[in-house]
Amino acid sequence: MGNWAVNEGLSIFVILVWLGLNVFLFVWYYRVYDIPPKFFYTRKLLGSALALARAPAACLNFNCMLILLPVCRNLLSFLRGSSACCSTRVRRQLDRNLTFHKMVAWMIALHSAIHTIAHLFNVEWCVNARVNNSDPYSVALSELGDRQNESYLNFARKRIKNPEGGLYLAVTLLAGITGVVITLCLILIITSSTKTIRRSYFEVFWYTHHLFVIFFIGLAIHGAERIVRGQTAESLAVHNITVCEQKISEWGKIKECPIPQFAGNPPMTWKWIVGPMFLYLCERLVRFWRSQQKVVITKVVTHPFKTIELQMKKKGFKMEVGQYIFVKCPKVSKLEWHPFTLTSAPEEDFFSIHIRIVGDWTEGLFNACGCDKQEFQDAWKLPKIAVDGPFGTASEDVFSYEVVMLVGAGIGVTPFASILKSVWYKYCNNATNLKLKKIYFYWLCRDTHAFEWFADLLQLLESQMQERNNAGFLSYNIYLTGWDESQANHFAVHHDEEKDVITGLKQKTLYGRPNWDNEFKTIASQHPNTRIGVFLCGPEALAETLSKQSISNSESGPRGVHFIFNKENF
């Protein structure tokens, strides 16, 4: 239990608090509409669907308040960089912002479904009561408001039978119109956010996500007509429901039972969402201001395996290891921003990203930079680039540990390029205050060509550590996870050579996948009583494996070895 608490305790606590608040709001508002006399006659008309519609509405307000906060990148980056505000454990929660964003989105979808279904029943009962297709009590309540000095309870004012009556309400009432619009927006946003769409059709994901603007506008005005009505306090004072509920035919005729008066509650949703919407507006203004700052591409390097490197400069740009930026190329798309990890080190006088060509946008950037041509491309012909960032990630905390495990899969190695470069520069400058004493680096890749662009950096580090008699500082293991029979024969022939046939490094390439249980146990035995940072940039399946290994190989109690798992999310 102690092992689990070290890695996941705070995360689970945050989730439980969030779930608890959802349960509290649901139960509280269910009782508000299901018990008090204010809504007695409304319950007579609508039944239990009244409370079942209003309770999830309160939860929707709460979650719609939260949904924008995890995507305020500049706010999170500010909090992350404030040591007075955020400890390492709190920063790890900020690094899971997108996970929380998705959880809140699914909660919004759940409560939207309950809210919508309950209101469909409400509409049916209101329309039926209006056309005398219901019990006499509901019909009598529905006739309130037809005469002068009366306020209505039933929001269906026209005598139109179902299903036409329900459709009429959907297209004439503000609540109906906005309800249809925001539900359609929500469906499009969620369905376009699947992993398949994001990876293969990012443009679809990007554009449909901006329907959130329409969603929030519709949400803010959804309740403006106040069609869910309850008895007013003044009416309750003179109209005692205990006495009058069975004397509906005598309402307005006897002194003790005047005709009840009804009114809707003032809209509340805007009060929940105005703060986050203001913060997000500030976020977008900061992004726009940054996008207008001049960025100069100083070099474009074409690497094997359809990977390009962009080296850039921007006035006032400051970065830390492992951070990422958003990039827009107006020549390719005037609206799309794409995230890329910085592969340069803070000590360098430029910042760089490595981009693998896998989609329409990256293909367009590849062509815009002239990488599809054989001849040299003049600098003035390179496209204009807009950059937003940098933004913090889990990898920023790598220098907070004495021992770290860095695990990259495929192009997921890019955050660690920045870290390893920075380590190299620190050793070149004889850094004496470096807390980090040992790096275990693992790189898993399917194709041999993918190793080529990264091998030079590893060779520099390898030689640097040997020159300074600190060869044990960096232990790296490169795994080739895909090969054919001819490659295997070639590797076997050259196995006894001094340097690896693929990378040119002294450390030989390994084939297959690591035995993570053995790796963790070996590292734990070599570093007792140590907090070891485990940093991954790779697929979810590998993240699940490493997270479980971090928990199972950590010792309970404050002392002993503890593996702290961190994963890149952007």
UniProtKB/Swiss-Prot annotation:
Topology relative to the membrane: Multi-pass membrane protein
UniProt: FAD binding residues: R199, S200, W337, H338, P339, T341, H354, R356, W361, T362
Annotated GO CC locations: dendrite; endoplasmic reticulum membrane; monoatomic ion channel complex; NADPH oxidase complex; neuronal cell body; nuclear envelope; perinuclear endoplasmic reticulum; phagocytic vesicle membrane
Tissue-specificity statement: Detected in neutrophils (at protein level).
Cytoplasmic side of membrane: 2-9, 73-95, 195-203, 286-570
Residue ranges annotated for the FAD-binding FR-type domain, each copy included: 287-397
Cellular localization per UniProt: Cell membrane
A molecular function (GO) term: protein heterodimerization activity
Main location: membrane
GO biological processes: cellular response to cadmium ion; cellular response to ethanol; cellular response to L-glutamine; defense response; hydrogen peroxide biosynthetic process; hypoxia-inducible factor-1alpha signaling pathway; inflammatory response; innate immune response
Cofactor: FAD
Post-translational modification: Glycosylated.
Annotated EC: 1.6.3.-
Domain Ferric oxidoreductase: 54-286
Catalytic activity: NADPH + 2 O2 = 2 superoxide + NADP(+) + H(+)
PROSITE patterns found in the cross-reference section: FAD_FR
Amino acids binding NADPH: I411, R446, T481, R513
Phenotype upon changing P304R: In CGDX; reduces NADPH oxidase activity to 4% of wild-type; translocation to the membrane of the phagosome is only attenuated
Listed InterPro entries: Cyt_b245_heavy_chain, FAD-bd_8, FAD-bd_FR_type, Fe3_Rdtase_TM_dom, Fe_red_NAD-bd_6, FNR_nucleotide-bd, RBOH/FRE, Riboflavin_synthase-like_b-brl
Binding, heme b 2: H115, H222, R226, I227, M268
Recorded disease: Granulomatous disease, chronic, X-linked: A form of chronic granulomatous disease, a primary immunodeficiency characterized by severe recurrent bacterial and fungal infections, along with manifestations of chronic granulomatous inflammation. It results from an impaired ability of phagocytes to mount a burst of reactive oxygen species in response to pathogens.
Subunit structure: Component of the phagocyte NADPH oxidase core complex/cytochrome b558 complex, composed of CYBB (heavy chain (beta)) and CYBA (light chain (alpha)). Component of the phagocyte NADPH oxidase complex composed of an obligatory core heterodimer formed by the membrane proteins CYBA and CYBB and the cytosolic regulatory subunits NCF1/p47-phox, NCF2/p67-phox, NCF4/p40-phox and the small GTPase RAC1 or RAC2. Interacts with NCF1 (phosphorylated form). Interacts with NCF2; the interaction is enhanced in the presence of GBP7. Interacts with RAC2. Interacts with RAC1.
Main function: Catalytic subunit of the phagocyte NADPH oxidase complex that mediates the transfer of electrons from cytosolic NADPH to O2 to produce the superoxide anion (O2(-)). In the activated complex, electrons are first transferred from NADPH to flavin adenine dinucleotide (FAD) and subsequently transferred via two heme molecules to molecular oxygen, producing superoxide through an outer-sphere reaction.
Protein name per the record: NADPH oxidase 2
Organism: Homo sapiens (Human)
Lineage per the UniProt record: Eukaryota, Metazoa, Chordata, Craniata, Vertebrata
